[in-house]
């Protein structure tokens, strides 16, 4: 076994089971492991307990158990400036952002790496389910994890090969049940801790509307069909996303008992467009346009500006076949679908894959059905 004792790995520890086992596995492999808890948001739960404080206590328990030093670093300002302001700005435009993608790019793999360097890190590691592979030229590639259900390359798709050069993903070859078993057998305090869900600054109780209304004044308005018939009232366009069914408060009517879905928004008129039926044609797009393009490595030299690959438009979606057309100035990408795709949502990431490799992503701006732009924002 290689002597890893002179290689320092700084592990981002959240107080969850995945990052706990990440630190444990690296310690067992003989690395000089240091744990760091990132405090990105000042939050209290419904009992007035700061959830970050509770998570940090779990980090302390795990670090003490496996015998590694640990620190806490406060990234609240960086998170506010680089992630949260973006999140609010996108909602103001009527879009549905994915803050996890931006948080990984700006905080967990930028601010955190800079901090880890101050601790003398040779590498950083996180509990993400993903993998990295170095090619013959020494360039890093982002690869899917073994556990396809947990694979998180979707959220890591705006990283580049330089950021990945110093990154380890020790959970790449494990499934979630295996990770829980390792934690249990090692007696880690986080072994049975449930996975965190939702956005970190909203928490798991899901009071999304209440939270968002603190930052953006809600403007109620009409819910209409595309032919202008008013069928209800919306609470504020920012609360709805394309393809949404729940929370509309609309039942069937004499023409149809099919459920209603959000099929569009008009920000200028403050109208939420709704239509009946899961297969409603207004939910299906033939292509999209996206910007804010980030490739893990230079795709143009590998594939050219026009190429076929697969893509996801949301986390845990099955890959679909697409043809990518990259503009000459690299500012815009047009993505044509092999088959019409449902509920393409502006503000979300479209993430590109070649087999097991994640090539990168872009942020969706517009969706089209043939030549007609869908009324999505």
UniProtKB/Swiss-Prot annotation:
Pfam families: tRNA_Me_trans, tRNA_Me_trans_C, tRNA_Me_trans_M. ATP binds at residues 12-19, 38, 127. Belongs to the MnmA/TRMU family. Keywords: ATP-binding, Cytoplasm, Disulfide bond, Nucleotide-binding, RNA-binding, Transferase, tRNA processing, tRNA-binding. The keyword Glycoprotein does not apply. It is found in: Cytoplasm. One of its GO terms (biological process) is tRNA wobble position uridine thiolation. Its main location: cytoplasm. PANTHER family: MITOCHONDRIAL TRNA-SPECIFIC 2-THIOURIDYLASE 1, TRNA 5-METHYLAMINOMETHYL-2-THIOURIDYLATE -METHYLTRANSFERASE. InterPro entries: MnmA-like, MnmA-like_C, MnmA-like_central, MnmA-like_central_sf, Rossmann-like_a/b/a_fold. Disulfide bonds join 103-200. CDD domains: MnmA_TRMU-like. The record marks 128, 348 as: Interaction with tRNA. Residues 150-152, 314-315 are annotated as: Interaction with tRNA. Residues 98-100 are annotated as: Interaction with target base in tRNA. GO terms for molecular function: ATP binding; tRNA binding; tRNA-uridine 2-sulfurtransferase activity. This is tRNA-specific 2-thiouridylase MnmA. Catalyzes the 2-thiolation of uridine at the wobble position (U34) of tRNA, leading to the formation of s(2)U34. Its EC number is 2.8.1.13. The gene is mnmA. The lineage of its organism: Bacteria, Bacillati, Bacillota, Bacilli, Lactobacillales.
């Amino acid at each position: 076994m290689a002597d890893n004792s002179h290689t320092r790995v700084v592990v981002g520890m959240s107080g969850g089971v995945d990052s706990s086992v990440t630190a444990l596995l690296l310690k067992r492999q003989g690395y000089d492991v240091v744990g760091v808890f990132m405090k990105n948001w000042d939050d209290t739960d419904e009992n007035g307990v700061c959830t970050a404080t509770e998570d940090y206590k779990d980090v302390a328990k795990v670090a003490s158990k496996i015998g590694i030093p640990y620190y806490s670093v406060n990234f609240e300002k960086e998170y506010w400036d680089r992630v949260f302001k973006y999140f609010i700005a996108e909602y103001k435009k009527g879009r549905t952002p994915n803050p996890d993608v931006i948080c990984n790019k700006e905080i967990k793999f930028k601010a955190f790496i800079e901090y880890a360097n101050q601790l003398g890190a040779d590498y950083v590691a996180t509990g993400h389910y993903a993998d990295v592979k170095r090619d013959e030229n020494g360039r890093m590639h982002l690869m899917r994890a073994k556990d396809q259900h947990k694979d998180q390359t979707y959220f890591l798709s705006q990283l580049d090969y330089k950021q990945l050069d110093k990154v380890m993903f020790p959970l790449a070859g494990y499934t979630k049940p295996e990770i829980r078993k390792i934690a249990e057998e090692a007696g880690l305090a986080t072994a049975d801790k449930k996975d965190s869900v939702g956005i970190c600054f909203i928490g798991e109780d899901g009071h999304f509307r209440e939270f968002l209304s603190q930052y953006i004044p809600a403007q109620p308005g009409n819910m209409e069909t595309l032919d202008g018939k008013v069928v209800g009232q919306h609470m504020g366009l920012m609360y709805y996303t394309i393809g949404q069914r729940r929370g509309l408060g609309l039942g069937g009517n004499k023409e149809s008992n099919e459920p209603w879905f959000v099929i569009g928004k008009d920000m200028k008129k403050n109208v939420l467009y709704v239509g009946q039926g899961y297969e409603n044609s207004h939910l299906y797009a033939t292509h999209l346009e996206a910007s804010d393009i980030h490739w893990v490595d230079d795709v143009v030299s590998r594939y050219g500006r026009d190429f076929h690959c697969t893509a996801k438009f949301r986390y845990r979606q099955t890959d679909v076949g697409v043809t990518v057309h990259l503009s000459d100035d690299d500012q815009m990408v047009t993505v044509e679908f092999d088959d019409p795709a449902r509920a393409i949502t502006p503000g979300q990431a479209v993430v590109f894959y070649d087999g097991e490799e994640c090539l990168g992503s872009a942020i969706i701006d517009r969706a089209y059905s043939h030549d007609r732009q869908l009324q999505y924002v």
